[in-house]
Amino acid sequence: MGIKGLTGLLNEHAPNSIKEHDIKTLFGRKVAIDASMSIYQFLIAVRQRDGEMLTNDAGETTSHLMGFFYRTIRIVENGIKPAYVFDGKPPELKKGVLSKRFEKREEAKEEGEEAKEIGTAEDVDRFSRRTVKVTKQHNEECQKLLRLMGVPCVIAPSEAEAQCAELARGGKVYAAGSEDMDTLTFNAPILFRHLTFSEAKKQPISEINLEAALKGLDMDMSQFVDLCILLGCDYLEPIKGVGPKSALKLIREFGGLKEVVEHLREKAAARKAEAEEEDEEEAEEPAPTSDVEMPDDEDGEKDSDDEEEAERRKKAEAAKKKKAQEKAKSAKKGKGKGKGGIQIPDEWPWEEAKQIFLKPDVIPADQVELEWKNPDVEGLVQFLVTEKGFSEERVRKGAEKLTKFLNAKQQGRLDGFFTVKPKQAPPPAAKGKGAASKGTKRKGEDKAEGSGKKAKKK
């Protein structure tokens, strides 16, 4: 899921933190790519014309393998050295989110079956994409493929994005590659997005610089993590009523999430007390009565007064009913917000979520060795062609490209040799009567020059 609304905030408040590149400009870079996110992307995007996933003759899914093989070759052809990082065991705090995702997939399956009966082809395609689940077999097959290709793989102890960030921070790679913005929350100094997108999309690579983002938002790393949690992350139920703008405003106003939570809980308690007081006042309101009791001997005036009293009661009851309906409607509309405000869920362990971001379970970068090797051509043919039904000609051509580019001596980047120095200001011009103005000559200079030239001719 990543961090909701973070990209929009950076575009608005820290535009200098985001740059766009053509993939060709990234030659010479090493990148740690979130493989688990890539598998999910390929299972959704790499499909047949009818919208179904690619399969071999045995009915086995091959979309993920097709995606990894050809997208990795494209990356390598452009002079980039990828290393893929796979998810390990998810944090305990994430289990609730994973459970909800499972429920949504089951709902999508049921809706997909119904769409097959009465829906359009677009409906069927949409629901089938929502049912995608990355399995253990998908992971194992992708790891096997990448090793045969000579591309390094790392199995993270927990979150792949956190391990990518660690490798970038430790200098093993230049950047982390993922679509999840929480890679920045894990303190990745540089994040590449859209690196594994299809070339047909013509989507430029987006580079996000964490230091520039913090500077633009005017906050430190701890506050940035607080902001990301408040925006909505993978570990906590989002707070209804808090959008990107209000989240940024709250963190800036109160300085941190601890103070924000205390403030919101106090406001929620005050609103609750106020609502209870209003309910008590309404319950104590006396039924409307006539102000004047008319005597019985006023020639039928008593009957007229009774009718007026009944009308007043009727109007009062109608007004009370309308007020109750408006109150119920308002409560329904602001459900979870506490009478039009923001209300934090009772169980909202943000401190635990913050610790996951600040101290993630990762392998230290200095304990990881990334090595790019020659591809095992015959191994690739056996796995992709014999077992998975790929075209042998295409597999061998792809292997040739891997051999050529993975083993080629990488051309150094100019930004690795040169340091950009600030432009020096020109020396100050002499001041006073004796100073000659730039682009002008003193009287007599033209004459002297002219006579000098004439003398030379002689």
From Swiss-Prot:
Primary location group: nucleus
Cofactor-binding details, from the entry: Binds 2 magnesium ions per subunit. They probably participate in the reaction catalyzed by the enzyme. May bind an additional third magnesium ion after substrate binding.
Any one of the GO BP annotations: DNA replication, removal of RNA primer
Binding site for Mg(2+) 2: D180, D182, D234
CDD domains assigned to the protein according to its UniProt record, in alphabetical order: PIN_FEN1 (cd09867)
Annotated region (N-domain), positions in chain: 1-105
Cofactor(s) of this protein: Mg(2+)
Disulfide pattern: none
Localization annotation: Nucleus, Nucleolus; Nucleus, Nucleoplasm; Mitochondrion
First-tier enzyme category under EC: hydrolase
Residue ranges of the region described as Interaction with PCNA: 410-418
Entry comment on modification after translation: Phosphorylated. Phosphorylation upon DNA damage induces relocalization to the nuclear plasma.
Chain positions recorded as Mg(2+) 1 binding sites: D34, D87, E159, E161
Binding site for DNA: R47, R71, E159, G232, D234
Swiss-Prot/TrEMBL keywords: DNA damage, DNA repair, DNA replication, Endonuclease, Exonuclease, Hydrolase, Magnesium, Metal-binding, Mitochondrion, Nuclease, Nucleus, Phosphoprotein
Acidic residues bias spans: 275-285, 293-309
GO terms for cellular component: mitochondrion; nucleolus; nucleoplasm
Region (Disordered): 268-347, 416-458
Residues covered by region (I-domain): 123-254
Subunit record text: Interacts with PCNA. Three molecules of FEN1 bind to one PCNA trimer with each molecule binding to one PCNA monomer. PCNA stimulates the nuclease activity without altering cleavage specificity.
Chain's role: Structure-specific nuclease with 5'-flap endonuclease and 5'-3' exonuclease activities involved in DNA replication and repair. During DNA replication, cleaves the 5'-overhanging flap structure that is generated by displacement synthesis when DNA polymerase encounters the 5'-end of a downstream Okazaki fragment. It enters the flap from the 5'-end and then tracks to cleave the flap base, leaving a nick for ligation. Also involved in the long patch base excision repair (LP-BER) pathway, by cleaving within the apurinic/apyrimidinic (AP) site-terminated flap.
HAMAP family in the record: Fen
Protein name: Flap endonuclease 1
Organism lineage: Eukaryota, Fungi, Dikarya, Basidiomycota, Agaricomycotina
